[in-house]
Amino acid sequence: MKFGWIKTTGTDSEERMDSVKDALESSIPGIIAEKDEISSVRELGNIKIVSDSLDADVVLINKGEDLEILKSAKLSGKETAVYVVINTKDDEVYATEVSKLDFVDYIVLEGSDWTIIPLENIIADLFGEEIKIVSVVTSVKDAEAAYEILEKGVDGVVLIPNDINEVKDFSKLIERMNSESVKLDYATVTKIEPVGSGDRVCIDTCSMMEMGEGMLIGSYSRGMFLVHSETVENPYVATRPFRVNAGPVHAYILCPENKTKYLSDLKAGDKVLVVNKNGETRESIIGRVKIEKRPLFLVEAEYNGENLRTILQNAETIRLVGEDGKPVSVVDLKVGTKVLIKPDENARHFGMAIKETIIEK
């Protein structure tokens, strides 16, 4: 996962605290702050503080300073970082060597001229190491380039922002860099039938979803159905664009990093994956999970000779995604209807994808 920090800017403490507020409002997870302003930052909100103080969450030293400080910080449970300004080949060598020390978590690299920062060399030299490489930049455009350099890119970026709009754009960039793309395809409905009542899970998120977005849910790991969010207007009940009526407690849901969870395991604060009709994804935080007894409906579909099944609540407001990305209510499903699924050749073990033969029926 890519991450981003903001470096506080301004000529006085008030201006620097404005930088902190901008970061908090834009969901930036960390900030490089002056050591004498750590308490002021904490008063504004919960954010990771990087500073040259043992009171910080990430203890930072500059090149040439005593590495014993980081050893002590690590022993006390802190994360650690070394800040290196790259001007010469010696700076590059130092950055590479210090990054291999087991008590250094982050190497923060700043170049006097962005175009000649030897990030490629450092990324290549540190391939396979546990260190997180962080680049300091002064624009969102340079941040994007740093995230993508040598395909792997840096792990994190420190932005020295010019204004709040740049911070917001930076936040959007981080979200986009961390978005996963999933392959969707159409399966053909072969059977629809009521199966009685069971415990159904509604997922209420902290995000507003749009038409064509939902979550991937299924009884089988090898094929999950795109269940549409409650964004469609109807005459019976108000829309709930933050909600997906997902299915019964046993079903899988696709979560970030290609992991699955049982619907029954979800709770407030967990992250789930919102997926649109094109397979583009974004993370969303669960605000509430509701489990209620409701009438259920079996949906069976065929994909490449395999039968896939899921169970959904038997209600007009529950929809899958049909042809052309249009939502189709479960009560309107017919044999032959095409619906979007995510096919998967992997089995699942504690939510992780594995290569194993598992029979699901």
Curated annotation (Swiss-Prot):
Keyword entries, A-Z: Amino-acid biosynthesis, Aromatic amino acid biosynthesis, NAD, Oxidoreductase
Record EC number: 1.4.1.24
Reactions mediated catalytically: 2-amino-2,3,7-trideoxy-D-lyxo-hept-6-ulosonate + NAD(+) + H2O = 3-dehydroquinate + NH4(+) + NADH + H(+)
Pfam families in UniProt: DHQS
Recorded superkingdom: Archaea
MF GO annotations: 3-dehydroquinate synthase activity; dehydroquinate synthase activity; NAD binding
Biological process according to GO: amino acid biosynthetic process; aromatic amino acid family biosynthetic process
Family the entry assigns: Belongs to the archaeal-type DHQ synthase family.
Protein purpose: Catalyzes the oxidative deamination and cyclization of 2-amino-3,7-dideoxy-D-threo-hept-6-ulosonic acid (ADH) to yield 3-dehydroquinate (DHQ), which is fed into the canonical shikimic pathway of aromatic amino acid biosynthesis.
Protein name: 3-dehydroquinate synthase
Organism: Methanococcus maripaludis (strain C6 / ATCC BAA-1332)
